[in-house]
Design a protein with these regions (language model features):
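Intrinsic low-complexity/disordered segments
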Residues: 1, 25, 30-31, 146
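Short, Lys/Arg-enriched N-terminal segments with co-localized hydrophobic residues
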Residues: 3-23
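Generic detector of N-terminal low-structure segments
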Residues: 13-16, 37, 48
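Bacterial N-terminal signal peptides that target proteins for export
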Residues: 26-43
Length: 625
């Protein structure tokens, strides 16, 4: 996850925190991509994300299908196929498997290796799995599939065809982004590894013993990238090294995350004798000291040795085929038939729209600018905030049953390197365990309300629980395009400003529009650096037009864009995609438009590419008329 700039900056004569609250939901290495490219590695399962410049509206999207004819019942052959595919993919590594399911056999998974996964260094460019799956999917007669299965088919085909088209770009793959990288995520994954029975503990210990081998394999792949000049810039390598060293300082301590969290979880497992507990504690300490710590140290050594090997610098477009890889990132996460140039124009027009909205509000009431600095949600308790959000969203979002969740805090050793907040989705057969992590150093108490709207209600936790209740094909939990998942969470986060109890609706709208504008500035910079070749100075010149007059802000933004290309776009372009869908529905339904019903349409569809959302919107609009 990207570490967002945390400075106060003037925008439109208004002070605003420029930090975008990003969650870990689907900040994940794509399991399908890793598995099918024979570069299998740990899936980061955070199951725990009308234009004013004259641009045409995207109503005429690429059609996913030519017919809406569907069967009244599920096609059992198709169900069997996609369930087997789900089982094959999850069997690739144990952490992914355990994160998604508590009882693998109930999902047809009877054979799996207890491993964190490995890159296949001998065949990194093998794309045969893509072609095989595409061929099988196309062999199904679409008219024999139920409506739900047709969505699964469309989503799978779109994903596989996109991966096949760009499968030659494997050299860009890395798991060592400064704040979304596996070196940061792994301790959190281990902390959230559920212990329900002794088998879970045994497998957990075995996974700890695989950390050094896992990083050794990763080092070999990074060496391959370095030999071709694709290794990260020294500035980024230094950041990763620093975060690894920070983890190493406390990893083996009694009160460190790897020891204390394990001991806490151990105490909650039924049926363990005092001797069992003592033995497991000793095994954990041994595994951490003999495998986890040496593994992280070897990662530091590898990064240090490869510094200076990078032949290129700056955004992706400065690398051979880098612009094409950026196109792949947007296509993969959004699935929206737009070119990067069109996305860039969409961001520009959205900035204009939000700024005009703020100007209009200020013209109606000039005192609103003076009141802006006093804006507050007046709530700081996480549980109280989530309770309040659950109550306030009922007019705009369909209700779901009560959800059990736990509020947790990122360990001190990881605070400087992880995102402001994150949501871990529950196992599919254990939906009552939901965890929301808060980074105390990345999120102030005054920012918790929109942060928890993003992570909880009506963001990730709400959307995850709603989707699970629709009984989707299991494979869709893995697919879950980031543009939908993070776009939804960002979209509702902006809406949450309307729930602030300021007694001034105009002020709430002003703050929401201001925040949305800042998000768009980040997406603009992401595109600028990675597709148009902006330098750090270009970033500064651009943001200085909006009052960002501190060059250190531009510096941090620039390296955030370089470290994790497309990550901001996933949030912001996804958010704008939902805004465009809403605008189309409002335009065609006029006074018959109902916001709650619109949100239900989005939620009923579940995480899919935006082309699929647009393609199915007309049928929903027809029902609403």
């Amino acid at each position: 996850m990207i570490q967002y700039v945390n400075n106060k900056s003037i925008f439109l004569i208004i002070l605003i925190k420029t930090e975008m609250r990003i969650s870990m939901r689907n900040k994940q290495l794509c399991l399908l991509h890793q598995f099918l490219n024979k570069a299998v590695s740990l899936l980061i399962v955070f199951i725990m994300v009308i234009t004013l410049s004259g641009c045409s509206l995207p109503w005429n999207q690429k059609q996913i299908s030519e017919t809406t004819i569907s069967a009244t019942e599920d096609n059992t052959d198709f169900t069997d196929y996609v369930n087997n595919l789900f089982a094959d993919l999850l069997s690739a590594d144990m952490v992914s498997l355990h994160a998604y399911v508590e009882h693998p056999r109930d999902f047809g998974i009877n054979d799996y290796e207890i491993t964190l996964g490995r890159y296949d260094l001998d065949n990194p460019d093998d794309s045969s799995d893509y072609t095989d799956i595409i061929s099988t999917l196309k062999s199904f007669d679409r008219s024999t599939l139920s409506a739900k299965q047709q969505i699964t088919l469309d989503e799978l085909l779109m994903y596989m065809e996109n991966e096949l088209e760009y499968s030659d770009l494997y050299m860009f793959n890395t798991q060592l982004q400064t704040t979304t990288g596996i070196h940061v995520q792994l301790p959190l994954l281990f902390a959230e590894y559920p212990f329900e029975e002794k088998k879970d503990i045994d497998e957990y210990i075995e996974l700890l013993c695989d950390v050094d081998g896992y990083f050794e394999n990763m080092a070999a792949f990074e060496k391959l990238r370095a030999d071709n000049g694709y290794f990260m810039e020294d500035t980024l390598a230094d950041e990763v090294i620093e975060s690894c060293n920070s983890f190493l300082e406390t990893a083996g301590l009694e009160d460190g995350a790897m020891i204390s969290t394990f001991n806490e979880k151990l105490a909650s497992v039924d049926g363990l004798s005092s001797q069992d507990i003592a033995d497991y504690k000793a095994k954990n300490v041994s595994a951490v000291n003999e495998h986890v710590i040496p593994g992280y140290q070897s990662l530091v050594n590898m990064l240090t040795s490869l510094k200076g090997s990078n032949r290129y610098s700056g955004g992706l477009c400065n690398y051979p085929d880098g612009s094409r890889y950026f196109e792949y990132i947007l296509s993969s996460t959004l699935g929206w038939s737009k070119s990067v140039d069109e996305y860039d124009k969409l961001v520009d027009s959205s900035i204009k729209k939000y700024m005009l909205k703020m100007q209009s509000l200020a013209l109606k009431d000039s005192s609103i600018l003076d009141k802006f600095d006093t804006f507050s949600f007046n709530m700081t308790d996480p549980v109280g905030i989530l309770t309040d959000l659950k109550k306030r969203i009922t007019d705009d979002f369909p209700e779901i049953p009560d959800v059990n969740y736990n509020i947790k805090y990122v360990s001190k050793a990881l605070e400087d390197y992880t995102s402001p907040a994150m949501y871990f989705i529950p196992q599919l057969d254990n939906l009552d365990i939901n965890s929301i992590y808060i980074n105390s150093s990345g999120t102030s108490a005054s920012e918790l309300y929109p942060t928890l709207a993003h992570e909880g209600y009506p963001g990730h936790m709400y959307q995850t629980q709603y989707f699970a209740a629709t009984n989707p094909d299991w494979i869709r939990y893995i697919l879950a395009p980031g543009g939908y998942v993070e776009g939804w969470a960002s979209y509702v986060e902006v809406l949450s400003y309307n729930y602030a109890q300021t007694g001034n609706d105009a002020l709430n709208k002003m703050y929401a529009a201001n925040y949305a504008t800042v998000l768009c500035l980040y997406a603009k910079g992401d595109i600028g650096v990675n597709y148009y070749g902006w330098s750090e100075d270009d970033v500064y010149k651009y943001i200085s037009q909006y009052g960002f007059d501190d060059k250190s802000v531009a510096h941090e933004m620039y390296y955030a864009f370089v470290s994790d290309p497309g990550n901001y776009c996933k949030y912001v372009l996804g958010m704008l995609g939902f805004e465009q869908l809403k605008t189309k529905a409002q335009s065609e339904l006029s006074d018959k438009f109902n916001l709650k019903n619109f949100h239900q349409y989005i939620l009923d569809m579940g995480p899919v590419q935006f082309d699929i959302l647009f393609n199915n919107l007309d049928a929903w609009i027809k029902k609403e008329k």
